[in-house]
Amino acid sequence: MIWYFAYGSNMNPARLSDQRLKERAVQMGPRIGGRLDGWRLVFNKVARQPAGAAAANIVEMPGAVVHGTLNRMPEAGLDVLDIWEGVAGGHYARRDVAVTRGDNGETVPAVTYVALKVGEGLKPTREYLAHLLAGEDLLPPDYHAWLKMQACLD
């Protein structure tokens, strides 16, 4: 079993578990809050549609923090996520990171995805941002409030 760190639309448990993993018979284990230090959340991943839309990405930045969800799953879950994240098409790449667990403060190795197809002046759609906001149960209130304030394309 591995830890997968979600900071974007996969923070929505229904999207990750029901729409992505379960349909490929991958059972997800515990889902807890996580903190990735030294990275910043940005919306610069070129989304498939509409024009000008962004998906979430993370970039290294000393002193910054990204909050998200740590999701326990079998390694086969990453193969499923590779398809959804467009790894073969060069959209995202897997990245090994160290994430601090929200429940006990322990730092654990995890896998996340970093965008490769990026652009400037992009914004998330409200529909996309709603997936991030669905992680509210495991996000610090101030981080969730910051997410809600993000400018959207529509």
What do these predicted regions represent?
Residues M1-D154:
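Glycine-aromatic micro-motifs
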